[in-house]
Amino acid sequence: QSGLEIYPNPDLKPESGWSTEIGIKQGIKFGNWMGYLDVAAFLMQYDDMMEFTFGQWGGSNKPLGGVGFKSVNVGKTQISGIEISLSGQGKINDNVTINILAGYTYMNPISLSPNDPYAYQIQWGDTVSEYTYNNSSSDSTVLKYRYQHIAKIDAEIVYKKLSIGTSFRYNDFMRNIDY
């Protein structure tokens, strides 16, 4: 067997939480263009949020010394942010139509309990150490493996029955990973 192991977690608890969102959707028209602008703010909070975490979860007698991934509960977390989207269609003439869909999302995914131990890891020599968000993260100010800024644009030009389109997606730098 080769590669990293996926280790079970019999102590894994289900995550629970709540969310709320408020927004506005407005129709817009400029000349031959019409569409919608949608702006929303959101807030989510989780208890016992689950995260796939890298570490030495098996004993030193396991393949790769017990290094691999395991799902763990990381405690109380919060994700807040805003979403803005714009969709529209414009007629250039009787034969040509342009469709556009654009969006931007800002998220602030944080741990509300960064110093609380959420897992215990077997180290080399069978010693045990605590995992907290602060001591297991490359940047403990945001949740692991999440982007804070995401933007996307889809555009399509339709000429009679022929269409051609393009898509662009931007994800900012992923600031926090296991280390």
Residue locations for each model-derived region?
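Gram-negative outer-membrane beta-barrel transporters
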Residues: 32, 36, 40-45, 67-178
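Outer-membrane beta-barrel translocator/channel fold
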Residues: 1-6, 11-14
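Flexible glycine-rich, low-complexity coil/linker segments exposed to the extracellular/periplasmic environment
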Residues: 2-4, 54-67, 128-136
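Membrane-embedded beta-barrel scaffold of Gram-negative outer-membrane proteins
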Residues: 13-68, 78-80
